[in-house]
Amino acid sequence: MLPNAMASNHVMPSGAPPVLPKADYRNAMARLGAAVNIITTDGPAGRAGFTASAVCSVTDEPPMLLVCLNRSASVYPAFTANGVLCVNVLAAGHQALSGLFGGKTPMDERFAAGRWSRKATGSPVLEDAAASFDCRVVQATSAGTHDVLFCEALAIAIGGAAQSLIYFDRRYHEIAAPPH
C-alpha cells in the first residue's frame, strides 16, 4: 500500500524533503517520452492554441483527460475564459506545426498552417491529427506554475495515420503501430 503523502501528519523520515536541482529534474523528465499534442480553443475570449506533451488519460467513464497549462502562458486567459478545448494528437510529419504552436508565432499564422474543422465545442480540430478529443473543462486545479485542466470529451475524431509523433530526449521521433 502506498503511504498517504497528502495526509497532514505525514513526515518524511529525514525531516524536510531534499531540494532537487531543477536541471537534474528537467534532464530526467526529458527521458519520459510523450505524445505531442496541439491544444486549441475558441470562444468569447478568442481562438488560441499551444503545443503540449503534458496530457494524460484520466478515466473512460466519463471519458476524461487532463491537460497541464502554464499560468504565465500567453494563451492562458483564452483557455480559462472559453472553458472548452480540443486535444489534437499529432501524427508523424507534424513537427513543423508543433514548432509553430510551441513558439511565439502569432495565432493567425499558427492556424493558417493547418486544416481545421469544428465539432461539439467549436474548438479547432486538426483534420489530419492522429486523434482529436473535443472537450469541455470540468475542473481546474493549481499545481506549482501550472493549472491542471480536467476535461470531459464530448466528441472525438480518429485519424487514419498509422504513425504518431512523440517527444523524447528533447527531440521529435516518429513511431508506427505494428501491422495487425
From Swiss-Prot:
What Enzyme Commission number(s) appear in the record? 1.5.1.42
Which top EC class applies here? oxidoreductase
Substrates-to-products reaction catalysed = FMNH2 + NAD(+) = FMN + NADH + 2 H(+)
- Gene Ontology MF annotations: FMN binding; FMN reductase (NADH) activity; FMN reductase [NAD(P)H] activity; riboflavin reductase (NADPH) activity
NAD as UniProt keyword: yes
Tell me, in a sentence or two, what this protein's role is. Answer: Catalyzes the reduction of FMN to FMNH2 which is used to reduce pyrimidine by RutA via the Rut pathway.
Family designation: Belongs to the non-flavoprotein flavin reductase family. RutF subfamily.
- What is the protein named? FMN reductase (NADH) RutF
Q: Which organism is it from?
A: Variovorax paradoxus (strain S110)
